[in-house]
């Protein structure tokens, strides 16, 4: 993907290209992500094409707060290893710092469920 975007090193050129794409081809799969207010939409715009849009910042903060509000006091999400892993991935994609206390608590919760060989129980 990096090679593809190299042709538009300037983020403003990337933005123009994406805006043209979603305008001219409303059925293009990226159109959904471009307009999405989900974590996937924000993450795609931030990480996939490298656009940190001003319009996304309040939404990004709202999504992070929403995810963190679901965390149980002991650190897990829905008492599930898979769900906790997914939430950690989402938080990372949304740009939450790895040293955030809630992320550290979730990682510790996962470590406590790890077997001696590294597998999760």
Give the role of each language-model region.
Residues 1-121:
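Preference for long, amphipathic alpha-helical scaffolds in soluble/luminal domains
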């Amino acid at each position: 993907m990096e090679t593809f975007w190299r042709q538009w090193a300037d983020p403003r050129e990337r933005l123009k290209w994406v805006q043209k794409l979603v305008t001219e081809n409303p059925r293009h799969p990226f159109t959904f992500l471009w307009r999405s207010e989900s974590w996937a939409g924000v993450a795609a715009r931030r990480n996939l094409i490298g656009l940190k849009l001003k319009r996304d910042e309040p939404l990004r903060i709202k999504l992070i707060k929403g995810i963190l509000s679901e965390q149980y006091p002991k650190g897990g999400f829905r008492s599930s290893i898979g769900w906790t892993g997914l939430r950690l991935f989402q938080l990372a994609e949304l740009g939450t710092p790895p040293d955030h206390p809630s992320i550290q608590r979730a990682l510790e919760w996962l470590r406590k469920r790890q077997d001696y060989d590294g597998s999760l129980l």
